[in-house]
């Protein structure tokens, strides 16, 4: 049975594989072991080989990893390092800042800008505040939130030059941009319910291991998984993939709990929840009023212990009586 540290590493790797890039599969080299959590260690969580012309959602993946680590009470924030060793350009994801990177031991450390030429043996290090500092001169302060603007990286890798272009994507509609978070919250609720069922079954059988006859799906490996609210290359807010084959990595893995997704759900679907409550209130009020004012269905009533037939005029008879009364009134006025 996997330890909690191994399960957390699998969850973080699945987040990177699923949301880092939209098109194509990623070449990911995963690392495992408790030394990944050691402070100052040079062992990354995973290493992703960057390809020419691809767009990578760096800020979204970074915020996702930071959110999960914060819920696990991890003391430090993740660090992304883009490096060029002359043979390949890679993105290394660390759970903390490795020692010696800023001092230049691994090569010159370049800052984040719109176009960054990445020569051989140079690196670009992205920390907790680098995305906000990069977006601040480009967008309004109200648009610094992840749902309104997102920093992405487009890689230009050729034989003679390697350039990283950092862009800010903005969503024309915040509701479309929040569908990814909505999907995450829905998946977490499904997993919480399925986890409770599995725990109940394990207690009944008397053990916590896998039960005979029940198969559990494994990790996603290096395959690319795209969420239903994933972003397009040109406009991440307009992309909507509705095919049933697009799964989230935690659909088959017990990775998210309801408490982890609660802050995101509360922030992102506040207005839809309010509208849902309004509809529920109106429905309850309407049903209550109908119950109060619905006439009796039976045509028999009991008054004072005596039976009395309840006569009610049909709609067409009421119309006939009204027309007759109007005709008699006109005749009376004509004769007078």
Swiss-Prot record:
GO cellular component terms listed in the entry, alphabetical order: host cell nuclear inner membrane; host cell perinuclear region of cytoplasm; membrane
Annotated phenotype, changing residue 121 to Q: 45% loss of budding ability
A Pfam family per the record: Herpes_U34
Perinuclear space domain ranges by topology: 1-315
PTM notes: Phosphorylated.
Record's subcellular location: Host nucleus inner membrane; Host cytoplasm, Host perinuclear region
Compositionally biased residues, Basic residues: 277-288
Region of interest called Disordered, as start-end residue ranges on this chain: 193-221, 277-297
Lipid bilayer topology: Single-pass membrane protein
Residues exposed to the Nuclear side: 334-336
Subunit structure: Forms a heterodimeric viral nuclear egress complex (NEC) with NEC1. Interacts with host IKBKE; this interaction inhibits host IKBKE kinase activity and IRF3 nuclear translocation.
Family classification: Belongs to the herpesviridae NEC2 protein family.
Name assigned to this protein: Nuclear egress protein 2
Name of the gene encoding the protein in the UniProt record: NEC2
